[in-house]
Structures are given as structure tokens and as C-alpha cells.
């Protein structure tokens, strides 16, 4: 490989050319509070992808994919693992609970998922979620409830405590587990002791845990790679279709979400670069997944929430129950302020609008188009939760189509009023809608362009 300079001498006023080489990465992100149906969009794109990656979060995410009538549930594994021709990557930004990962793989194996371990690559820089992180997650929730009378509503999967360990530089990574086990054991014991000092009721079976971790190390060793080099090679090698599957969603982002009722990672587009070690230059299409109405799990402000028959109807018709927690989701009308905000941050190429069929029975459908604060319209999405609680939503009313859309497979098949609803969203947010979902199966995603 020659290392000749590829740009002219700066002294002569020459400019370095923009390096536009390499494969582009397609990204799928949630544009609301999660549960938008990202798994289905990923599944659609994964059939043609060579590499499918997760870049952040852990097994707090829940994606359901239906293939040939069989439902697969994914939490840590990229849902593209179903594609037997593709490689799945768990990036450095993901936090990994090893027993959770193996249990999930085995459960899906029983449903027919074959040879997953030959298709999975785990970044050696990913941090490990230990059982005590999960225990601490539960203890912190109890503490919050006692102090403030409210909790964050975490999934108790140890995600927050693991990212805390990572930020305070006491965390342990996959590369540590696979290296000198004696050194790993010492650091593991120190970390456990730190948590026990903070939470005196915390019980940690150190020796039992280490014994299991040693076994996990051997199970995963063949799957572990240097993630940065792997992605660099994939991007700069022969043409490949690379897909990144975001977990959680814009309003759960640690920086841009409805803080503190958020997750502990960046679930917006920036998390793709930091969670896989890829340059922004190689980000291609960014698809936002939007449900045709809004849902939220746990507490926190929710301007368009409907605590009435509408909310109940959306909840029952949409089967709005969390994949990871089994909790009922709160439901409300579609909120375009949220979508515009998510688009400001992510710069979506297009939207996938899912679960349109849930609105089939409505006489009238409302869409939140703007917020007012003290009688004045505000052009932004408030950062402060107390302020967000106080906003007044301005709605536009659209007539319902009152007919079953679940059998529609082409845009022309949709009732005109349903088409109007889709166009209304596009025009108000300024992002084209590429897919419209009218059911659970792969076939029920109508592609528009």
C-alpha cells in the first residue's frame, strides 16, 4: 500500500479533496418514544443487506419480526440476524449482558434461527452488563420512588448503571474479558465492591459470577473482532449494503430526549458514528420510523396523550404492550412537533409510517400540529419537562376513512382519506413517506417510491 500524499501542498494554496469513497450506511431510527415498528423496517431492508449493525442500547430494546408466520423477538441481537446471508454486528456503543444474549439466541434457535454464531460479530470495545448492574438498576428505581414519589420506568436491564460505569471509567469491556482473566477478576471484584458500598443490601456472588463469565468468554471468543477495523474494511472494501438498526428513539435520547425520562445512550444519528466507529461521511439514507399515532411507556410529559376512549381504543386495537417489560403503553394522537424535532436532529431522508390500520375505525382523526405556551406558539420542542407538561397542543382534524386497510398492498389501494392523512404528515413535516404499514407481516408495508 503506497502512502503517497493524496492532496496538493497546502503551501501552494491547494485544497485536500473530499474523500467520498466507500460504501454508504443506511440507518433506521425511531422518531418518537420507541415502539414505532423499527424491527419491521429493518427486516424489510435486511433482506437485501450484507451487514446489519446495532450501535447503542442493550437488551432494553425489543424488536418483533414476523417471518413465515413465526414471531421472533430480539433484544440484543440485531433483528437482521434472521437473514442467513448477512453478517450481524454488535457495535462498541452497545452494552452487552452475556447471559441475556445467549438466552435470546437459544430461544430464537428453538423457533428455527440457525447458525447465528457464525454470522455474529461482537466489537471488542463493547461494555459488559453484569448481573449486579441489573440489580442496581432495580435498587435505584426503588430509591427514586422513595425520594421523589416517581421513578424513571427503566426496564431494569442494567443499561443505565453500565453506561454510568463506562462514563466513570470503571466499566469492563469484552476485550478485558477475553484477555488476562486474573486481571479481569480483580477489576470485576473492585467494581462489585464499589456498588456494594453504595448499596449495602446488594448481594454479589463474585466467585459464581466469575465462573460463569469465564465460560461465556469461551463461547463468544470466536465472534469477537476489532469493531473499528471490521467496519472500516466493510465500508472501504467491495460494494456492500450496510444497515444500522437504532434501538429506542429520538425522545429517549440521553441528550435530546424528554430528560430525565430517557435511556442512557444516544439513539439519534450521532450514536451511529460513535457506536460503531464510522465517519459521518459514510452515513447514507437515514430513515425515521413513525407510528401513525403516538405511544409512550412509563412516566413523563406526553402532550397529545388521550386519557379517554380514544386512548383506550388505540391501546387495545394496537396491542400496545411493551415487548421487553409487558407494560401497557400510553397512547395519544400523532404529534408533528415531535416529528419535526426528531428531523432537526437526524435529518431524515424519508419516513416509514406504521400501524395506519389501527386508525381504520376512527370517525375523526386529530393530529397535533403545534404547541402554544402561555397563548403563544413556540417553534421549538421544550427541553424542560415542566414546560412540556404545560404546553397546549393545537390540533388539525382530519376525517376518518372508516374502512379496513389491512389488505392494501399498493398506494392506490388505500382509501382517499387515508392517502390524505399520509400526505398531510409529509407536507407538515417536510419529510417524504417511503413506506406505509398496515399490518404485522412483511407484505403489509406499502412501498411508495
UniProtKB/Swiss-Prot annotation:
Protein's cellular compartments: Cytoplasm
Binding residues annotated for Mg(2+), in chain numbering: 35, 62
The keyword Cell inner membrane is annotated on this UniProt entry: no
GO CC terms in record: cytoplasm
One Pfam family hit: Adenylsucc_synt
BP terms from Gene Ontology: 'de novo' AMP biosynthetic process; IMP metabolic process
Cofactor note: Binds 1 Mg(2+) ion per subunit.
Gene3D superfamilies membership: Adenylosuccinate Synthetase, subunit A, domain 1, Adenylosuccinate Synthetase, subunit A, domain 2, Adenylosuccinate Synthetase, subunit A, domain 3
EC number: 6.3.4.4
Reactions accelerated catalytically: IMP + L-aspartate + GTP = N(6)-(1,2-dicarboxyethyl)-AMP + GDP + phosphate + 2 H(+)
Positions with a binding annotation for GTP: 34-40, 62-64, 329, 355-357, 437-440
UniProt cofactor(s): Mg(2+)
GO molecular function: adenylosuccinate synthase activity; GTP binding; magnesium ion binding
Active site annotation, chain numbering: 35 (proton acceptor), 63 (proton donor)
Binding positions (IMP): 35-38, 60-63, 155, 169, 248, 263, 327
Keyword Ribonucleoprotein: no
Pathway in which this enzyme or protein is active: Purine metabolism; AMP biosynthesis via de novo pathway; AMP from IMP: step 1/2
Sequence segments annotated as region (Disordered): 1-22
UniProt cross-references to CDD domains, sorted A to Z: AdSS (cd03108)
UniProt keyword terms in alphabetical order: Cytoplasm, GTP-binding, Ligase, Magnesium, Metal-binding, Nucleotide-binding, Purine biosynthesis
Regions of compositional bias (Polar residues) in chain numbering: 1-10
Subunit comment: Homodimer.
Function: Component of the purine nucleotide cycle (PNC), which interconverts IMP and AMP to regulate the nucleotide levels in various tissues, and which contributes to glycolysis and ammoniagenesis. Catalyzes the first committed step in the biosynthesis of AMP from IMP.
Family: Belongs to the adenylosuccinate synthetase family.
PANTHER family with a match to the protein in the record: ADENYLOSUCCINATE SYNTHETASE (PTHR11846), ADENYLOSUCCINATE SYNTHETASE ISOZYME 1 (PTHR11846:SF2)
Protein name as it appears in the record: Adenylosuccinate synthetase isozyme 1 A
Organism in which the protein naturally occurs: Salmo salar
Amino acid at each position: 500500500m503506497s502512502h503517497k500524499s493524496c492532496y496538493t501542498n497546502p503551501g501552494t494554496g491547494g485544497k485536500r479533496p473530499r474523500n467520498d469513497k466507500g460504501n454508504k450506511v443506511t440507518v433506521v431510527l425511531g422518531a418518537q418514544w420507541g415502539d414505532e415498528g423499527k424491527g419491521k423496517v429493518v427486516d424489510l431492508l435486511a433482506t437485501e443487506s450484507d451487514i446489519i449493525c446495532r450501535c447503542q442500547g442493550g437488551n432494553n430494546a425489543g424488536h418483533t419480526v414476523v417471518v413465515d408466520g413465526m414471531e421472533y423477538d430480539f433484544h440484543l441481537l440485531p433483528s437482521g440476524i434472521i437473514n442467513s446471508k448477512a453478517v450481524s454486528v454488535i457495535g462498541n456503543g452497545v452494552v452487552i449482558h452475556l447471559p441475556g444474549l445467549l438466552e435470546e439466541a437459544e430461544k430464537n434457535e428453538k423457533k428455527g434461527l440457525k447458525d447465528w454464531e457464525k454470522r455474529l460479530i461482537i466489537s471488542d470495545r463493547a461494555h459488559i452488563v453484569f448481573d449486579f448492574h441489573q440489580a442496581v438498576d432495580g435498587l435505584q428505581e426503588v430509591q427514586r420512588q422513595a425520594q421523589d414519589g416517581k421513578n424513571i420506568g427503566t426496564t431494569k436491564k442494567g443499561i443505565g448503571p453500565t453506561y454510568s460505569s463506562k462514563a466513570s471509567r470503571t466499566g469492563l469491556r469484552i476485550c478485558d474479558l477475553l484477555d488476562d482473566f486474573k486481571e479481569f477478576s480483580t477489576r470485576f471484584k473492585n467494581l462489585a465492591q464499589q456498588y456494594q458500598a453504595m448499596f449495602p443490601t446488594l448481594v454479589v456472588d463474585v466467585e459464581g459470577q466469575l465462573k460463569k463469565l469465564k465460560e461465556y468468554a469461551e463461547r463468544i471468543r470466536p465472534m469477537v473482532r476489532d469493531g473499528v477495523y471490521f467496519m472500516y474494511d466493510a465500508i472501504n472494501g467491495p460494494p456492500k449494503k450496510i444497515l444500522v438498526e437504532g434501538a429506542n428513539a429520538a425522545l429517549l435520547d440521553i441528550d435530546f430526549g424528554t430528560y430525565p425520562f430517557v435511556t442512557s445512550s444516544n439513539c439519534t444519528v450521532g450514536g451511529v458514528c460513535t457506536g460503531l466507529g464510522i465517519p459521518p461521511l459514510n452515513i447514507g439514507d437515514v430513515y425515521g420510523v413513525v407510528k401513525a399515532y403516538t405511544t409512550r411507556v412509563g412516566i413523563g410529559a406526553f402532550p397529545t396523550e388521550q386519557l379517554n376512549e380514544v386512548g383506550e381504543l388505540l391501546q387495545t386495537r394496537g396491542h400496545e404492550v411493551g415487548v421487553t417489560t409487558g407494560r401497557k403503553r400510553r397512547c395519544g394522537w400523532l404529534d408533528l412537533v415531535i416529528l419535526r424535532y426528531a428531523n432537526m436532529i437526524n435529518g431524515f431522508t424519508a419516513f416509514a409510517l406504521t400501524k395506519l390500520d389501527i386508525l381504520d375505525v376512527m370517525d375523526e382523526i386529530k393530529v397535533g400540529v403545534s404547541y402554544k405556551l402561555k397563548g403563544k406558539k413556540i417553534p421549538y420542542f421544550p427541553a424542560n419537562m415542566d414546560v412540556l407538561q404545560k404546553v397546549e397542543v393545537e390540533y388539525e382534524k382530519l376525517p376518518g376513512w372508516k374502512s379496513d386497510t389491512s389488505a392494501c398492498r399498493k398506494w392506490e389501494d388505500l382509501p382517499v382519506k387515508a392517502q390524505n392523512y399520509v400526505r398531510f404528515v409529509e407536507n407538515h413535516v417536510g419529510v417524504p413517506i417511503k413506506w406505509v404499514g398496515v399490518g404485522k407481516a412483511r407484505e403489509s408495508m406499502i412501498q411508495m417510491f
